[in-house]
């Protein structure tokens, strides 16, 4: 139930995890979600991760593709991938450029533009002459540049009912600029019954972020939101004062990790170790501006308000073992992590405190799996732990016990998966995020919620139906989640809650249906997703509830031949007004219906 941490190529951030960019879909090889825990990446990953892997070098002398698509909103996306593999050497170059205009509506005629450039380069070499064991060394470089409209301000409920895609022109200059570089050297050696994988990495990220922070000297709340809406509808002759929160942040990380996978007959033992250090230099400023009668914005010079540097160093070691006897498998694991955290203040601000502490703990795991042919049954118990961040005044770690039982069935095109789990949190970390618009010291802090109980059920069904020359893949996924506070508590970020209250924002029920048809060179796929009503009574919000929502997407492909493909995709087919967040800073929604037409050439 805790937030899933994002990792890319096994790299997990500690300081300022929000300072990162994810690669475009066309440059991803796979995305793997581990909702329960991934101990190998340390304490943060012990609460689940979403792991992005970049494109692999294809084992072919030459391969590649060119793809271009446009949308009904005049968006353009173009991508290129080219790879070679000659004897012991291989290389890959991939790039993608995205330009989006968006379908948001500003009364001053502005656009919610986005431009994003991705570049990926890889080169590898397999065993050279004289090598005693098969091995491979690979170097990866990745570059991502993002320039986009990014605002946390929503709209009032009345404006949402009238035009859900409206944006207030006070945010027309809310902008994000980010640039990320990543270098990674990986080495793998096969020693017969064992395999050793090692990685060395360095990454840097620079961010400039301007966002509306105050209106007429007051922080954004429900009252000021209505005032902003009123001015946008009927601007005053003299205009109104606004303040921009200006950020100039830099992040860097370096680390090394290794994993040794040893096979002893049917049994397997994996040893892993990791060293990671990162630093986030955060600089905040205030910039006054005049929102004029023509809805344009004239900005003054910005003034520095606060500045601090967070750095963290983590040492992680783990041992995982898998013991097999006939149809029985027993999994035993133990992880240890030591984290040192420091915060230095270079420009003092009220509510911002320095920090210098370290923490460590053990994370054991026990699991049993029984394979009965078509059926598989398993149970898993583990303890999860994550050190506090520099903004946690009490320096309390996040701790929980996870329990899970599951059953899987697979036979003749039918797949079924049923899981039930319980998570007992002794302490749960909360940060200022999409629940509310934070432009004060809440941005700098991490708070603690004691005693949270979460439990749920997940059901997945899949069937591959063959009807003559037609292939019809069908799927169903259902999730039930309940998360409750076990103790009454108050925090600055979420406000006050009572024992038995539900955690805000989490839907109890989620359902996804998928259906497709494949015939010769034609493919058609439909996906429909449902989320039950969600509650917003916490995080200082007076917006109590958002009703259940449906979203449907459809995609169709036509393969002209083995080299050329045409495709059409329609997202939000029903053109629903889908709420992504709601608080005293307003309601924000996804884009409306948008259609894509694309072409792909493979060679």
Per-segment meaning from a language model:
Residues 88-106, 114-118, 205-253, 312-348, ...:
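Surface-exposed extracellular loop regions of Gram-negative outer-membrane beta-barrel proteins
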Residues 83, 89, 124-128, 142, ...:
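Conserved C-terminal beta-signal and adjacent last beta-strands/turns
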Residues 63, 70-99, 107-151, 175-190, ...:
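Transmembrane beta-barrel wall of Gram-negative outer-membrane proteins
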Residues 21-63, 602:
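A beta-strand signature from Gram-negative outer-membrane beta-barrel systems
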């Amino acid at each position: 139930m805790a937030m899933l941490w994002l990792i890319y190529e096994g790299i997990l951030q500690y300081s300022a995890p929000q300072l990162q960019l994810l690669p475009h879909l066309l440059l991803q090889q796979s995305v793997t979600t581990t909702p329960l825990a991934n101990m190998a990446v340390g304490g943060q990953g012990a609460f689940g991760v979403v792991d992005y892997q970049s494109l692999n070098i294809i084992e072919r002398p030459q391969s590649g593709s060119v793809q271009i698509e446009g949308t009904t909103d005049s968006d353009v996306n173009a991508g290129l991938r080219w790879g070679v593999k000659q004897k012991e050497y291989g290389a890959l170059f991939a790039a993608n450029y995205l330009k989006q205009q968006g379908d948001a509506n500003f009364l001053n005629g502005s656009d919610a533009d986005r431009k994003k450039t991705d570049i990926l380069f890889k080169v590898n070499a397999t065993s050279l002459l004289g090598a005693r064991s098969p091995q491979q060394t690979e170097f990866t470089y990745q570059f991502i540049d993002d320039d986009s409209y990014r605002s946390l301000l929503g709209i009032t409920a009345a404006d949402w009912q009238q035009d859900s895609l409206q944006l207030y022109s006070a945010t027309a200059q809310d902008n994000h600029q980010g640039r990320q570089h990543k270098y990674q050297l990986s080495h793998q050696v096969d020693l017969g019954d064992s395999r050793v994988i090692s990685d060395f990495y360095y990454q840097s990220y620079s961010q400039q972020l301007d966002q509306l922070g105050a209106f007429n000297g007051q922080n954004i709340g429900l009252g000021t939101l209505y005032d902003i809406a009123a001015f946008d509808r009927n601007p005053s002759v003299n205009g109104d004062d606004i303040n921009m929160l200006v950020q100039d942040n830099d992040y860097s990380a370096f680390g090394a990790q290794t994993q040794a996978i040893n096979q002893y007959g049917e049994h397997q033992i994996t040893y892993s170790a990791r060293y990671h250090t990162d630093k986030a230099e955060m600089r905040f400023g205030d910039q006054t501006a005049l929102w004029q009668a023509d809805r344009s914005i004239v900005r003054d010079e910005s003034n520095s308000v606060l500045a601090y540097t967070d750095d963290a160093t983590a040492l992680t070691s783990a041992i995982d073992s898998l013991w097999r006897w006939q149809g029985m498998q027993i999994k035993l694991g133990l992880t240890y992590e030591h984290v040192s955290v420091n915060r230095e203040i270079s420009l003092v601000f009220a509510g911002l405190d320095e920090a210098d502490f370290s923490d460590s703990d053990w994370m054991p795991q026990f699991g049993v799996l029984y394979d009965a042919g078509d059926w598989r049954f398993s149970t898993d118990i583990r303890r999860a732990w994550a050190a506090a961040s520099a903004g946690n005044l009490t320096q309390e770690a996040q701790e929980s016990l996870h329990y899970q039982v599951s059953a899987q069935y697979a036979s003749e095109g039918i797949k079924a998966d049923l899981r039930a789990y319980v998570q007992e949190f002794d302490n749960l970390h909360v940060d200022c995020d999409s629940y509310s618009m934070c432009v004060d010291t809440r941005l700098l802090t991490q708070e603690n919620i004691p005693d949270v109980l979460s439990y749920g059920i997940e059901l997945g069904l899949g069937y591959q139906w063959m009807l003559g020359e037609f292939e019809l893949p069908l799927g169903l996924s259902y999730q039930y989640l309940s998360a409750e506070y076990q103790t009454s508590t108050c925090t600055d970020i979420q406000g006050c809650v009572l024992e038995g209250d539900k955690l805000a924002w989490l839907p109890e029920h989620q359902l996804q249906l998928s259906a497709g048809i494949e015939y010769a060179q034609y493919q058609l796929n439909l996906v429909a997703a449902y989320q039950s009503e969600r509650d917003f009574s916490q995080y200082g919000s007076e917006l109590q509830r958002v009703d259940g929502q449906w979203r449907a997407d459809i995609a169709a492909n036509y393969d002209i031949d083995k080299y050329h493909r045409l495709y059409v995709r329609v997202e939000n087919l029903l053109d629903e007004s889908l709420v992504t967040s709601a608080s005293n800073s307003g309601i924000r929604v996804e884009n409306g219906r948008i259609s894509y037409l694309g072409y792909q050439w493979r060679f």
